Swiss-Prot record:
Name this protein carries in UniProt: Transcription initiation factor IIA subunit 2
Keyword annotations: Cytoplasm, Nucleus, Transcription, Transcription regulation
One Pfam family from the record: TFIIA_gamma_N
Protein family membership: Belongs to the TFIIA subunit 2 family.
Functional note: TFIIA is a component of the transcription machinery of RNA polymerase II and plays an important role in transcriptional activation. TFIIA in a complex with tbp mediates transcriptional activity.
A GO cellular-component term linked to this record: cytosol
InterPro entries: TFIIA_a-hlx, TFIIA_b-brl, TFIIA_gsu, TFIIA_gsu_C, TFIIA_gsu_N
GO molecular function: RNA polymerase II general transcription initiation factor activity; TBP-class protein binding
Gene Ontology biological process: RNA polymerase II preinitiation complex assembly
Taxonomic source organism: Schizosaccharomyces pombe (strain 972 / ATCC 24843) (Fission yeast)
Subcellular location field: Nucleus; Cytoplasm
Keyword Lipid biosynthesis: no
Amino acid sequence: MSQYYELYRRSSIGISLTDALDDLISQGKISPQLAMKVLFNFDKSMTEALAEKVRSRLTFKGHLDTYRFCDEVWTFIIKNPSFRFDNETVTSNKIRIVACATRDSSANR
């Protein structure tokens, strides 16, 4: 089992990567095994980059509509959230937050 979650594959960049890999597979330019290696490296790179390079902070408020805990993964559905950055506020109708336990014991600091 992979030590990295596949969450970022559902982001816009992850979907674009998956579509491009599917095209390459259907054209016979790469094998499905190579595509899986690329996706694994994508999962690893996204996880490491977000853990090591992103240092921005924000606060948010909203109405908790739904929450679930299944297989060590929390999912929260927040309605009417308001995000406050340093000098900007952004709102939305609904967001989903997915929080996963780290699989790397050295990351528990």
